[in-house]
Every structure is written in structure tokens, then in C-alpha cells.
Amino acid sequence: QFEPDDIIELAQGEEVTARLVKTFSDDNWKVFFSPLSEEDFADVPEKWSVLVQNLEQWSTELGQLWNKFGFIPQWQRDDIMVSYAPKGGSVGKHYDEYDVFLVQGYGHRRWQLGKWCDSSTEFKPNQPIRIFDDMGDLVIDEVMNPGDILYIPARMSHYGVAEDDCLTFSFGLRYPNLADIFDNVNKAFCHQDPELNLSEFQLPLRLTQSEQSTGKLADENIQAMKKQFLAKLAESEAFDALFKQAVAGTVSSRRYEMLVSDEMSDPDEVRSILEEEQGVLMQDNNCKLLYTENPLRIYANGEWLDEVNVIEAEVLKRLSDSEALDWAFLNNLVNDTEDPESTMELLLDSICNWLDDGWVLIE
């Protein structure tokens, strides 16, 4: 679908996240960030590379390739990145903090994988990107052809060099960090299940009194509060529910702002496509959609959807599991309700909202 000129043109878009890496020598690298322009590409050295993030935003078809990685839970997905480089182009020897699957889409690229890295790994000084020279003993040294896939674990050193004009697509994974979870715990306290009783967190802490200076907050008092704080978190069922909500909100959030169309979907048109044209409803993989159980809760792009009804929750749950839903399934689902026709009308309205928000698509 994509060719090199497509990526160069896409990288110059106003709302695109891209980087242009120019290699003037082994010790002279320059990086240019979005927004990129024609002038940036008019003055490139022999070796250079451009990387575009969040391709799901710009290609629905490419985003659906995530379904080929069904063994990866949706909450671990980050985004799809593409790297274009002419012969000799590279981003240097480096490592990443996340796992990645590389898919060669066009041309050929030579990949070398070497030693494991960590926070003590030394990088080349005075460079705008984290690169190094020493990869240790190579464990892989292969040329990837179109259609080949290479898995690179987090913190494994790697080095990719274009053999000719080539495009490599990176399906990146990620795990949450504690700072993001802490932030979402606070959000969960502000937006929690109204049936959840949080009164236990409003009780004053019990501290042993001791003689101390009037203005001093003693370290032993702070440590005593910390001990009670951690003990309460470990034993509280209410906090378990909040923590589940916080984690789900964290891992369902998108790293990049989601762009949506101004067009409004029409329920009658959606019904016609599904019922008469045998269309199927699918998740748009530009959206992060997932659920937790006990009880069933749906999350989309970092938000808990606390207002969806039982029918909508079932549809979104199945979509998040990569199911394609046809009219027969939707019809059977609403036929089990007291008022099937009204329920279907409400569901079609919701599907239109999901289409407008970029959560789902119809094929």
C-alpha cells in the first residue's frame, strides 16, 4: 500500500508526528522533528532516514494488521511506526525500552542484533539520539525481505541499515509506568463507582505522640504514615477496585492525540450497510478499546465508559476481542430484550457515535 514517496509526503503533514534523522558522519548526526517541510528533505546527506509514528491514524487498513498479532493483548499495543531510508540510511546502533515486531514492507534492510543493554550502557557523547558503537557479539545478522518479520525484545541492541530504498513497519509494545498509574489512581478517586464506599480513606491516621519541636515534621511520623498508607492499600477491597480502574485507564490511553472526522454518521445508512449490504462492524485499531471483568467495564482511549448499557457493553467487548459483528448477530442480541426495535434504534445511534469518534469501522 505504501511506497517511499507516500511516507515522505505524509511526514510533512501538519498533524503528523515524524522525525528526520540525517547522518553526516559516524560522529555527526542531526535530528529534525515535526512539523517537517520540503526544505528539510531538499537538503539531505547520502544517508538519512525518516520515521512516522501512529500510522493507525492515517491508514485504517494498516491499523487492521494489529489483528495479525492476536497473541498480543490489546492493552500492550503502542502504535505502528514506519521508517523509510535510502541505501545506507539508518538511525544508528541503539536499544529500546519496549518490545517490537519489525515487518519489512518495501525494499530490503539488514538487521544486526547484539548484546543486552541497561541503564549503564554508554552512549556516544554530544549526539541528539541515544546511539553507541559496541553491540557485543552479534546473535542475528540478516537481510530482511518484503514480508519478513523480526522480533526484538526490549533492551536488546539492534542496528538496521537500508540495502536499498526501503520501508520497515514497527509494531511497538508498551507497559505502563508507575507515574502514569499514580496519576490515574487520583483520577479514579474522582470518577469512581457511586456504589463504592471510600469512607475508610477519610478516617484520620493513628499516630504515636512524641515530644518534638513546634515547627518540625519528624521523619518517624512520615514513615509511620507511609506504613499505614501502604497497609491500607494492601488490605482494602475498595482500593483494589480503584486500582483496577486506574490500570485500565492507563493502558487504554493513547500516546498520540486522536483526530476525528467532522462528518456525522446516519443511523439509517448504517443499518442499510449492515443489513442489506452484508457489512460487518469492527474495531478501528486507531482506538484503544478494552474491558475488565467482575464486573464488566469497558474502556476506550483511557476513559471508563460508565454510561453504556448491557447491549452496548457486549458489542464493545466483542469488538475489542477482534470479532467482526454482522447484522444477524446484532439482531439476535437485541431480540432478547423487551423492546427489540427501540433497543436496535438506540444501538444504531451508539454505533454512529462510535463511528464519529473513530472507535469502530464498517467493512
Predicted regions and their residues:
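Active-site region of the double-stranded beta-helix
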Residues: 1-148, 156-209
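Fe(II)/2-oxoglutarate oxygenase catalytic core
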Residues: 1-44, 74, 217-220, 224, ...
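Glycine-rich, charged/polar anion/phosphate-binding loops
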Residues: 154-157, 283-285
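Long, charge-rich alpha-helical interaction segments
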Residues: 188-249
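Acidic, low-complexity/disordered tracts enriched in E/D and polar residues
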Residues: 234-320, 352, 363
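Long, charge-rich, low-complexity alpha-helical segments
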Residues: 304-363
